A protein has these predicted regions:
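Charged helix-capping and loop-helix junction motifs
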Residues: 139-149
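Core dinuclear metal-dependent hydrolase active-site scaffold
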Residues: 17, 91-118, 122
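Conserved beta-strand hairpin/beta-sheet module of binuclear metal-dependent hydrolase folds
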Residues: 1-45, 115-125, 131
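Histidine-centered catalytic micro-motifs
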Residues: 52-62, 104-112, 162-168
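Accessory terminal helices/loops
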Residues: 2, 147-211
């Protein structure tokens, strides 16, 4: 597997290139805010784009989609989770050469948030960061995100976590690391504790020296 994390500008955004080494077909995840950096990586790896995937619809993840429209080598690029007519179901899979992309619906940060699992890697968008979780608006969204994060935590502890922004101390981590170190994940047994941290996060960060 070819797997590339791409620093794509904006608010420390990450885009991703996932490709089959057998067919050189590629999936691009969140090609924004600077799609040219993604295009450069596609050229460098000499791959053919098959899928454009958005982890969610926020502009800083989806604005570059239109740079990848049209047909390449006689085949249309397939857009996934890029609007109402491209919705992917929870647990649905797609083939990418010898690779299987598995989609996990993780609403909370947004209603359309998804994570993508391929082999031992999990691209989490704005659902889960290194040491942090995605922002939510109000108690109801926080509850939905709480349930989504619990769904992710049943994955094997060595599953690699690849987030949508560089908000942590490292560019990636693992499910096991997050279970032991992420203050939000450590509060997934009780929603009231998770919600408390959501509501008091600025103060908590200051008291614990978290950037």
């Amino acid at each position: 597997m070819i797997f590339k994390q791409i620093e794509s500008g904006g608010d420390r955004n990450y885009a991703y290139l996932i490709a089959s080494e057998e067919t050189m077909e590629a999936a691009i995840v969140d090609p924004s805010p600077d799609p040219q950096k993604v295009i450069n990586m596609v050229k460098e790896e000499v791959v053919e784009i098959k899928y454009i995937i958005n982890t969610h619809s926020h502009y800083d993840h989806s604005a570059g989609n239109d740079k990848f429209g049209g047909t390449k080598k006689g085949r249309s690029i397939i857009f996934i989770n890029c609007g109402s007519d491209t919705v992917i179901k929870d647990g649905e899979t797609l083939e990418l050469g010898e690779l299987i992309l598995e989609f996990i619906r993780t609403p909370g940060h947004t209603e359309d948030s998804i994570c993508i699992k391929v082999e031992d890697k999990l691209v989490t968008g704005d659902t889960l960061f290194v040491g942090k979780v995605g922002g939510t608006y109000g108690e109801e969204d926080s509850k939905i995100e709480f349930e989504s994060l619990n769904k992710l935590m049943i994955l094997p502890p060595d599953t690699e976590v690849w987030p949508g922004h560089n908000y942590g101390e490292t560019p990636s981590s693992t499910i096991g690391f997050e279970l032991k170190n992420n203050p939000f994940i450590k509060r997934l047994d009780e929603f009231s504790e998770f919600l408390w941290l959501k509501q008091n996060w600025p103060k908590y960060k200051l008291e614990h020296g978290i950037k």
